[in-house]
Regions:
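Active-site beta-loop-alpha junctions enriched in small/polar residues
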Residues: 1-4, 33-35, 73-75, 102-106, ...
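N-terminal beta1-alpha1-beta2 module of alpha/beta enzyme domains
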Residues: 1-62, 163, 264, 270-287
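Glycine-enriched alpha-helix->loop->beta-strand junction motifs that scaffold or abut catalytic
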Residues: 62-65, 93, 179-185, 255-257
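Hydrophobic faces of well-ordered beta-strands that scaffold small-molecule active sites
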Residues: 1, 28-30, 68-70, 97-101, ...
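Internal, glycine-rich beta/alpha segment that forms the wall or movable "lid"
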Residues: 36-43, 75-181, 196-210, 215
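An alpha-helical appendage that flanks or caps ligand/catalytic pockets
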Residues: 21-22, 26, 118-158, 188-292
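Active-site mouth loops of central-metabolism enzymes
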Residues: 1-10, 71-80, 160-170, 228-242
Length: 292
């Protein structure tokens, strides 16, 4: 989904979303970046990024069937207003939302949010607990290490059901957390996909240890997809169209249940002329469509 850089205009969002739905794609995904610290080497993608949830609300209004996901919003936000936003988005999209959560990794964003990054793991677990309470309990009341809620009603609840929660992260503790607490796991843009099967296995193992059904979990891969005309040494999902199609099949064999192609992480797209970037995206949508 056009979300970063000059190509991320409402017109491009509409063009990509409606074409993806016509071509039989199953999901549209967004991501979050609140700040780009001056001098930070994180790359051009993060320099200019639209809000992920407002973008999804726009997409919900111009599509009918395709699912909507965020990978990820970070748990340095406050869970009560986020729970309300996600519940509303789930309802207005008629149940099409998937909520991916991360812990965050940019110190300046933690500082701006007034959150201590040293305790982000425990905070993230309590964050998930609060979200689910907000979506399910008739009366919400919470006294935790990080959050407090006096007895309150939190209505309306998300309809037709609460959105599934995916957790990100690649460290062992993060993968085990996803298996214990979440409805699945989502990989990051920096993921070394050669090791994704082992990470999926670890999430499943943690789910089993927690008495949960690992077969019910989703494993979502953010595909940093970069089409390049000539074959050669490369990372997964970078290369010719044929190589990328082979990689898609290989990822399914590794246990990936959902793959989305994220062109925002291709420097040839985010730094290109917006019209040229959109043309490239539309060609790729056609070439990699599920029925292609």
């Amino acid at each position: 989904m056009p979300q970063a850089g000059a190509w991320a205009t409402p017109e491009a969002m509409r063009a990509v979303a409606t074409r993806a739905e016509r071509l039989g794609y199953h999901e549209l995904w967004t991501f979050q970046r609140m700040l780009y610290p001056v001098g930070h080497p994180m790359g051009p993608t993060y320099r200019s990024v639209h809000d992920p949830l407002i973008t999804l609300a726009y997409l919900a209004g111009i599509t009918e069937r395709i699912r909507l996901g965020v990978a990820v919003v970070n748990a340095f936000l406050q869970p009560v207003p986020l729970a309300k936003q996600l519940a509303t988005l789930q309802t207005v999209s008629r149940g099409r939302l998937t909520a991916g959560l991360g812990l965050g990794w940019v110190p300046e964003e933690f500082e701006a949010a007034g959150v201590d990054p040293a305790r982000r793991g425990r905070r993230g677990e309590e964050f998930v607990e609060v979200l689910r309470m907000m979506w399910g309990a008739e009366v919400v009341e919470h006294r935790g290490e990080f959050y407090r809620i006096s007895p309150s009603h939190a209505d309306p609840k998300p309809s037709p059901a609460p959105p599934p929660i995916l957790l990100g992260g690649t460290a062992e503790v993060a993968l085990r957390r996803a298996g214990r607490l979440a409805d699945g796991w989502v990989s990051s843009s920096r993921e070394d996909l050669s090791g994704i099967a082992a990470r999926i296995a670890l999430v499943k193992s943690a789910a089993e240890e927690a008495g949960r059904d690992p077969g019910a979990l989703r494993f979502v891969c953010r595909g940093v997809t970069r089409v390049r005309p000539e074959p050669g040494e490369r990372r997964r999902l970078t290369g010719t169209l044929e190589e990328i199609r082979d990689d898609v099949a290989w990822l399914a064999e590794q246990g990936v249940t959902d793959l989305f192609h994220d062109l925002n992480f291709d420097p040839h797209v985010v730094t290109a002329d917006p019209a040229e970037a959109l043309r490239h995206a539309e060609e790729l949508l056609e070439a990699l469509a599920p029925s292609a």
